[in-house]
């Protein structure tokens, strides 16, 4: 599929993360988060996680963008945004994160908002909260 054909297939909402090492990020998202890689080249990767289609772009693809200097300065990325996955076993995800050496920001625990979650960071510092309901919704 060409890039412009792919762009026309995107849903109403999707996520695009700019990453410093595309291969390392693909490994994190497939091995730890459980996404399926649907396409990749040296600049770009498309992944699917259930209904979510999301993208990774290598930093160098933004070399003419106003963000480029900030991207390559080593500043932590994604600060202030938390991506959440619900209906996902947080204990199993934490085990995969440990197995693959991923950064665990918060170990699994039951939260006051009604779900058990784990919080992990991808290799570039993007934060993911993954969990499931602690009891059935009534």
Residue ranges and their predicted role:
Residues 1-16, 36-88, 92-121, 132-138:
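Vicinal oxygen chelate
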Residues 18, 23-38:
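N-terminal first-folded block
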Residues 25-30, 97, 122-125:
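Conserved active-site tyrosine of GNAT-family acetyltransferases
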Residues 127-130:
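Short glycine-/small-residue motifs
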């Amino acid at each position: 599929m060409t890039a412009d054909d792919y762009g026309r297939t995107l849903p109403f909402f999707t996520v695009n993360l700019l990453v410093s090492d595309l291969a390392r990020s693909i490994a994190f998202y497939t091995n730890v988060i459980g996404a399926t890689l649907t396409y990749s080249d040296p600049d770009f990767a498309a992944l699917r996680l259930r209904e979510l289609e999301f993208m990774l772009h290598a930093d160098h693809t933004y070399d003419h963008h106003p963000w480029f200097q900030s991207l390559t300065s080593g500043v932590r990325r994604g600060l202030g945004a938390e991506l959440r996955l619900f209906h996902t076993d947080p204990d199993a995800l934490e085990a995969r994160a440990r197995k693959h050496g991923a950064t665990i920001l918060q170990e699994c625990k039951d939260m006051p908002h009604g779900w058990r979650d784990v919080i992990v960071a991808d290799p570039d510092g993007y934060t993911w909260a993954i969990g499931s309901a602690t009891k059935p919704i009534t």
